[in-house]
Amino acid sequence: MLHDSLGCVALWREFPAELARATGRDVIAYDRAGFGRSAPAQAPLPADFIAAEARDSLPALQRGFGFAGFVALGHSVGGAMAAACADAQPEHCEALVTISAQAFVEARTLEGIRAAREAFARPDQFERLARHHGERARWVLDAWIDTWLDPAFAGWTLDATLARVRCPALVLHGEHDQYGSPRHPARIVEGLAGPARMMLLPGCAHVPHREAKPAVLQALHGFLGAPAR
């Protein structure tokens, strides 16, 4: 499980355990480098930070946990990273699941980030972030805001990655996601080279696995079915 730009294992809450029960699969959720309880990052995010997660972290997880095949699931930017994992290891990726993933830089995305920047300027809101990231909180927040608002990032898209992903995919998105319109899941489904299903969740914003958890778990149960043994 690949978390979002401000996320960590703790912020998935009970979802990983519930996902394991719903699908009968082992679930691995981890803090990306610089987030949660991982070691603090020593530098800004690299320009290729999405591809780097598939290139560097995925093999480390495979070595550490002793697995090869996997289903890649990610939330928000973690969804883009999950797609990168599917692209990087097509021989090992059984399926792809994206939740509220961005496929390009949209005005709504930037507006949502600017609004969040204002909100986190308040000490009480920043303290909520620090509760989960500790001394890493400032780096976590700046990495998200500075990357997405950087004009050099404005032309980023997931298109090239999607075109190489052939495994089955489930693309979940909240109808009222403040960080991305329904154009994102539509573009993901259209761009994937393999079979894909889009599910737009009514009444949901950016965190469907919290806002519409029963529907999300049911969809994942139906999509993943019994694990291969």
Mark where each language-model region is:
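Serine-hydrolase catalytic-loop signature spanning alpha/beta hydrolases and amidase-signature enzymes
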Residues: 4-14, 27
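Active-site loop/oxyanion-hole signature of alpha/beta-hydrolase fold enzymes
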Residues: 23-70
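Flexible "cap/lid" loop of the alpha/beta hydrolase fold
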Residues: 80-88, 92-125
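Short beta-strand/loop motif that positions the catalytic acidic residue
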Residues: 165, 171-173
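Short alpha-helix in the alpha/beta-hydrolase fold that links the catalytic acid
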Residues: 167, 181-190
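Acidic catalytic loop of the alpha/beta-hydrolase fold
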Residues: 176-180
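Catalytic histidine neighborhood in serine/cysteine hydrolases
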Residues: 190-206
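Catalytic histidine-centered segment of alpha/beta-hydrolase-like enzymes
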Residues: 204-217
